[in-house]
A protein has these predicted regions:
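Eukaryotic intrinsically disordered, low-complexity regulatory regions enriched in Ser/Thr/Pro
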Residues: 123, 156-237
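Intrinsically disordered, low-complexity regions enriched in proline, serine, glycine
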Residues: 59-61, 69-70, 91-95, 103-106, ...
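Short acidic loop-to-beta-strand element that houses the catalytic metal-binding Asp/Glu
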Residues: 72-95
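A short acidic/basic microdomain associated with nuclease active sites
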Residues: 51-80
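Acidic, Ser/Thr-rich intrinsically disordered and amphipathic helical segments
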Residues: 12-19, 41, 45, 93, ...
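Catalytic cores of nucleic-acid endonucleases
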Residues: 97-162
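Conserved beta-strand elements of beta-rich interaction domains across eukaryotes
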Residues: 57, 62-65, 83-87, 97-101
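Interdomain/boundary linker segments immediately adjacent to catalytic/signaling cores
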Residues: 1-51
Length: 237
């Protein structure tokens, strides 16, 4: 599932996001302390670094009212506006904690494998994001059914779509920079979040390299075989 790669612009932005996240040190998060942070400091700093890199990036906060059996809520993520000469500006979504949206109780092994195949950080369009949501909601229903458990409202397709499809406020760089006076309990969680994020990204990239090795080795063998045949052909003249 993770191999559903985006286009060139998405892949380039994904590479930039990975590099910037690896470059962040926990001491840099101090400028964005603001109460219960829940990773907001990481997102604001990433937006700052993306803007320095020339991207039109912003933190987006979506909010929605509950309806029927769907609870209300809010969500914070990042978007980047990319110029497209053919279709006009294109909006790409960045979610730095993507897998957490699909975690469920007592998940069966196949679901856990599918969850681990998701990108650690999502970078892409809303239509491609919706494809992920559809697949994961169906898989979650099946997994929960194996344990005779219902799908909770906050894992329904309607609720998940509200996170990125609801009306949102696009914010610039966080202006309320505060002096860091030690790691508060809430902000200390962000240090752990950043550490786990980097660790997961390293594992993802390493796994990707291992998966590519057989393909690269096969390509090398084909090249070597072609070269031997070419040389024999030249020597036969």
């Amino acid at each position: 599932m993770y191999k559903q790669a985006g286009d060139e612009k998405e892949n380039k932005l994904l590479s930039v996001v990975h590099s910037l996240l690896f470059s962040i040190h926990e001491t840099e998060l101090q400028d964005f302390v603001r109460g219960q942070c829940t990773g907001s400091c990481i997102r604001h700093l990433l937006v700052k670094l993306l803007r320095y890199s020339g991207y039109d990036a912003a933190v987006c906060v979506s909010k929605w009212q509950g309806f029927d059996k769907i609870p209300g809520g809010d969500h914070e993520y990042i978007d980047v506006i990319i110029d497209n000469d053919l279709t006009g500006p294109e909006r790409l979504i960045i979610d730095i904690d993507f897998r957490s949206h699909f975690e469920i109780a007592r998940a069966v092994d196949p679901y856990g494998t599918l969850l681990d195949s998701l990108p650690v950080v999502y970078v892409g369009t809303l239509p491609r994001l919706k494809q992920f949501l559809n697949v994961m909601v169906d898989a979650a229903k099946w997994s929960l059914k194996q344990n005779s458990m219902p799908l909770p409202p906050w894992r329904s397709l309607s609720y998940l779509q509200m996170k990125w499809h609801s009306k949102y406020e696009r914010k610039g760089l966080h202006s309320e920079q505060q002096e860091f006076q030690g790691a508060s309990p809430s902000h200390a969680l962000c240090f752990g979040h950043l550490k786990r994020l980097k660790s997961s990204l390293r594992l993802e990239l390493e796994t990707g390299r291992l998966l590519m090795m057989p393909v690269m080795q096969a390509g090398t063998k084909r090249t070597a075989m072609y070269e031997r045949r070419r040389r024999r052909s030249l020597l036969s003249f």
